[in-house]
Design a protein with these regions (language model features):
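Membrane-proximal basic amphipathic "stem/tether" segments
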Residues: 1-42
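A structural signal for well-ordered alpha-helical scaffolds and beta->alpha junctions
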Residues: 28-32, 46, 174-175, 206
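Structural motif
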Residues: 38, 79-80, 182
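Conserved SAM-binding loop
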Residues: 44-131, 211-216
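S-adenosyl-L-methionine-dependent methyltransferase catalytic module, highlighting the catalytic core
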Residues: 101-104, 108, 114, 118-216
């Protein structure tokens, strides 16, 4: 969602929600055919939710942007059958969802994953910005790269930056609650993981948490 759309949502929330629903529904009809084509192919299905790794070989990117392979509102159920996906990856998506929306999406991921399939996630590390606020660490200007979201009044704006992102962010994570959320969802062998240069975006490594879990 663009910054302008976020501002309009704050002023006219009901109108913007209805507009997004109608537009997304219309745009997603062709996407159902693309999902069906994935199922008909002989290759393993690997989904990149949020499209951060768009173009990564072997992964199908899915999000509400035309740059992705498949245009889809991830707040809605995935049009895929149970136990049909080998791997799911998501980078810097879940902070844009409310806690409830994030829980629903994780449940969808578990539903479509095959037994033994992996769910790998990357999100911003809120603790970095909170540590800056309480004086535990100093962080460089690159941690506030999106200028519309950084007001730079006092130390609290380090927290405001990552928590709200000018209306873009809905929920924040540290490693403890990220691992708890994944484990509580039913994933097993949940653990933190290292940066993966074949998948994760290097320019976001400095502010990111990584975790992975497996469907039983």
């Amino acid at each position: 969602m663009s910054g302008i759309r976020a501002k309009l949502r704050n002023s006219f929330p009901f109108t913007i929600v209805i507009y997004e629903f109608v537009i997304s529904k219309k745009s997603m009809w062709p996407s159902r055919k693309k999902f069906a084509a994935l199922l008909d192919s002989s290759t393993s299905i690997c989904l990149d939710l949020g499209g951060a790794g768009a173009g990564t070989r072997g992964w199908t990117s899915v999000d509400m942007t035309q740059e992705c392979d498949i245009f889809w509102d991830l707040r809605l159920p995935l049009p895929l059958p149970n136990n049909s996906v080998a791997k799911i990856y998501s980078s810097h998506l879940f902070e844009h969802l409310t806690y409830k929306q994030g829980q629903e999406l994780i449940r969808e991921c578990l539903r479509v994953l095959k037994s033994g399939g992996t769910f790998s996630i990357c999100v911003p590390d809120a603790r970095i910005y909170i540590d800056s606020y309480v004086g535990i660490r100093e962080i460089p200007a690159e941690f506030f790269g999106w200028k519309p979201a950084f007001n730079q009044t006092t130390a609290i704006d380090a927290v405001n930056y990552v928590a709200f992102m000018d209306g873009e962010h809905k929920y924040m994570f540290d490693l403890e609650n990220l691992l708890h959320i994944l484990s509580a969802s039913g994933l097993v062998d949940v653990s933190a993981r290292a940066f993966d240069p074949s998948l994760d975006r290097a320019e976001r490594d400095y502010e990111s948490l990584y975790a992975i879990g497996t469907k039983r």
